């Protein structure tokens, strides 16, 4: 059994908007290309192909997430907000915009559902015994998104959605998340805060992002 690469070119079409850093949009600040842009992920895929590592991977098609998949993690109100912004030409989602703008493009919810579905696809293929392990190369990212809001460029909490699939649909007893990123995986932590079936570990820089989040004393409810 192989290692799987979960890949869908449509994830590279996610529109993350322009980037103003910690500032709100302003006519006096020149925006930068967004730091969560397509090049960051496509470069990984290109390197896998150029180095021929891809030949040893099982490239697996994504099964798009359903509304029910999303609602295992996110509130109905938040899902409807994403749908409304997506169907109205796109725009900012994050209420706490100074803590990381989260933009979704016109009809961008379809891409966000593909990304969430990519995480589920990885879990499903491993649980079905088709793959030993899998890497989902997807965007928009997810570990900052909380149950009721976007944050830090993240629309849906992809890993948490895959975790809920494993627990609620496949009826696993216990799962664990190891989040290795300079930023705290606040979204995954908050979603499973009171769920003893999930163990969340975040390895991150202290007091980086979100500010004040991810202290060693945070051990669940």
Specify the residue positions occupied by each region the protein language model found:
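HDAC/HDAC-like amidohydrolase catalytic core signature
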Residues: 1-221
């Amino acid at each position: 059994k192989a290692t799987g690469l979960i890949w869908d070119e449509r994830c590279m079409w996610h529109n993350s908007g322009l980037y103003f850093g910690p500032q709100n949009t302003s006519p006096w600040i020149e925006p930068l290309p967004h730091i969560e842009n397509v090049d960051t992920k496509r470069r990984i895929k290109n390197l896998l192909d150029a180095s021929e590592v891809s030949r040893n991977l099982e490239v697996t098609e994504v099964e798009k997430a359903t509304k029910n998949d999303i609602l295992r993690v996110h509130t109905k109100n938040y899902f409807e907000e994403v749908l409304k912004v997506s169907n109205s030409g796109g725009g900012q989602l994050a209420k706490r915009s100074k803590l990381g703008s989260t933009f979704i493009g016109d009809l961008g919810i379809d891409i966000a559902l593909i990304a969430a579905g990519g995480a589920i696809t990885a879990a499903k293929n491993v649980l079905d015994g088709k793959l030993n392990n899998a890497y989902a190369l997807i965007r928009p990212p997810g570990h900052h998104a909380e149950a009721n809001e976007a944050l830090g460029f993240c629309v849906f909490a992809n890993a948490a959605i895959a975790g809920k699939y494993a627990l609620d649909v496949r009826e696993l007893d216990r799962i664990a998340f190891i989040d290795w990123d300079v930023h705290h995986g606040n979204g995954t932590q908050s979603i499973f805060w009171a769920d003893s079936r999930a163990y969340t570990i975040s390895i991150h820089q202290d007091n980086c992002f979100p500010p004040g989040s991810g202290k060693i004393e945070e051990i669940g409810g």
